[in-house]
Amino acid sequence: MTSLPGGIYDGDLGDQPMSGLVPMVVEQTTRGERAYDIFSRLLKERIVFIGTPINDQIANLTVAQLLYLASESSEKPINLYINSPGGVIYSGLGVYDTMQYIGAPVSTICVGLAASMGSVLLAAGEDDSRACLPNSRVMIHQPMGGAEGQASDIEIQAEEIMWLKERLYEILALHTGQDIDQIEADADRNYWMSAEEAEEYGLVDNVLNPDNLEGLKSIQPNGEAADDSEDDA
């Protein structure tokens, strides 16, 4: 049996604790009341939230939301909030590639934790639109995984995880401006950073304290969707 390369989360990636705990939001419109789950309501404001470990299910939902918002407007920013310990690298790379592919700029904001693949997605946001809240924690490290079976199968899996490691380091170097050798040295073990240290490292551009929110409107809810809600069918 081979485990997919991933991050620090050691639970079942198929068991998402948020399921069944999604609150509903009720809005008053000229046509009566309308109820949304909270994530659909945030989507109307062009906000996408990754708040769990990243697996195929979460990645597919995130990709679908990004594609939908990009089809609605290729110019208005999308705000991607991240509170994730990471997860399956292949799933995360699907989200990463979508962020780079769509025309709409994607702002990224770390709320709580962006570790492993979560830190890669955080760094992959639009230039000057990547941020952490003050008490966020960010962590980079090399891929984790394991393999069982014949020696040839283990060798194949080892080659694959080495390729993934090199590719992730290239992505981090691209978005942080750090030298690949420096990233490789830092990521050899879990490399934890505060919000300020993540900014200094180049993973984000700002730490969102109350005194520096002015001018960062690209990562603020735009409120336009709320104005349009009464005109919806």
Swiss-Prot record:
Broad EC category: hydrolase
Subcellular location(s) per record = Cytoplasm
Its BP terms in the Gene Ontology are: protein quality control for misfolded or incompletely synthesized proteins
One GO molecular function term?
A: ATP-dependent peptidase activity
**E.C. numbers:** 3.4.21.92
* GO CC term (a single one): cytoplasm
Tell me which domain of life the UniProt entry assigns to the organism this sequence originates from: Bacteria
Task: Provide the reaction this enzyme catalyses.
Answer: Hydrolysis of proteins to small peptides in the presence of ATP and magnesium. alpha-casein is the usual test substrate. In the absence of ATP, only oligopeptides shorter than five residues are hydrolyzed (such as succinyl-Leu-Tyr-|-NHMec, and Leu-Tyr-Leu-|-Tyr-Trp, in which cleavage of the -Tyr-|-Leu- and -Tyr-|-Trp bonds also occurs)
Q: What does UniProt give as the signal peptide span?
A: none
The annotated region (Disordered) lies at 214-233
Could you tell me the keywords of this UniProt record?
Answer: Cytoplasm, Hydrolase, Protease, Serine protease
NCBIfam families, alphabetized? PRK00277.1 (NF001368), PRK12553.1 (NF009205)
Q: What does this protein do?
A: Cleaves peptides in various proteins in a process that requires ATP hydrolysis. Has a chymotrypsin-like activity. Plays a major role in the degradation of misfolded proteins.
Q: Subunit composition?
A: Fourteen ClpP subunits assemble into 2 heptameric rings which stack back to back to give a disk-like structure with a central cavity, resembling the structure of eukaryotic proteasomes.
Q: Which PANTHER family match?
A: ATP-DEPENDENT CLP PROTEASE PROTEOLYTIC SUBUNIT
Q: What is this protein called?
A: ATP-dependent Clp protease proteolytic subunit 2
Species this chain originates from = Salinibacter ruber (strain DSM 13855 / M31)
The gene that this protein is the product of is clpP2
